[in-house]
């Protein structure tokens, strides 16, 4: 089956891509939606410019869509972009947001496409542990009390994941960050032919939240 994967470069959309390839789907496109609205209900924001490197690393064409990020209108912008693609299904990294999934399902139904969400209602702790084992995944944004500046740019590993999960438990943070408490970016994965290396980055910090801005990055051979 020919599919497109909605792709932000984060842990969930990379898992969706990993799953689709493992299932034997013919992944024709990665579709990234760039929103002008930093508070977008639908689309992941930090470091989306790096998805071009991600797509190159995987060897799958990237389709960039743009939206002002106005509620509901951004769904129409997604639909307009998807209807041009020669695919039979859409794969997403939706975990628990009924807001997101119901709208993607509706778009797929209207376009006659199948909708796949391999992480839907999976255990959040299982998700975080699985993606951190499969991928080189780093935290690139923190937006919840309890997650401090020290996590920005940090890779989630077997050495620190228990500490991270304990913080989530203590402060009521969703363990897969489904509420937008943190954002991630994947720098290497089994389906990447090369890995992404950060050349230049800076941390923006505002007392209770912050972003790891990747100014420059490049593809390098895997070791």
Curated annotation (Swiss-Prot):
One GO BP: protein histidyl modification to diphthamide
CDD domains: AANH_PF0828-like
InterPro entries per UniProt: Diphthami_syn_dom, DPH6/MJ0570, MJ0570, MJ0570_ATP-bd, Rossmann-like_a/b/a_fold
Name this protein carries in UniProt: Uncharacterized protein MJ0570
Top-level division of the source organism's lineage: Archaea
Alphabetized SUPFAM superfamilies for the sequence: Adenine nucleotide alpha hydrolases-like
Pfam families linked: Diphthami_syn_2
Gene Ontology MF terms in the entry: diphthine-ammonia ligase activity
């Amino acid at each position: 089956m020919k599919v497109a994967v909605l792709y932000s470069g984060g842990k969930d959309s990379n898992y969706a891509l990993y799953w689709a390839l493992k299932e034997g789907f013919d992944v024709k496109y990665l579709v990234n939606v760039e929103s002008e609205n930093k508070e977008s209900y639908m689309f992941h924001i930090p470091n989306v410019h790096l998805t071009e490197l991600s797509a190159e690393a995987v060897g799958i064409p990237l389709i960039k869509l743009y939206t002002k990020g106005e509620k509901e209108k951004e769904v129409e912008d997604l639909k307009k972009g998807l209807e041009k693609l020669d695919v039979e299904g859409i794969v997403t990294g939706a975990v628990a947001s009924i807001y997101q999934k119901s709208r993607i399902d509706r778009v797929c139904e209207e376009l006659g496409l199948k909708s796949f969400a391999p992480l839907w209602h999976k255990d959040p702790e299982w998700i975080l542990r699985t993606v951190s084992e499969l991928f080189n995944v780093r935290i690139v944004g923190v937006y919840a009390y309890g997650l401090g500046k020290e996590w920005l740019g940090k890779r989630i590993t077997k050495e620190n994941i228990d500490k991270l999960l304990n913080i989530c438990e203590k402060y009521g943070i969703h363990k897969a960050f489904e509420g937008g408490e943190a954002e991630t970016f994947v720098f290497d994965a089994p389906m990447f032919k090369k890995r992404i290396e950060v050349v230049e980055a800076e941390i923006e910090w505002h007392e209770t939240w912050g972003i790891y801005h990747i100014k420059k990055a490049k593809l390098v051979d895997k070791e």
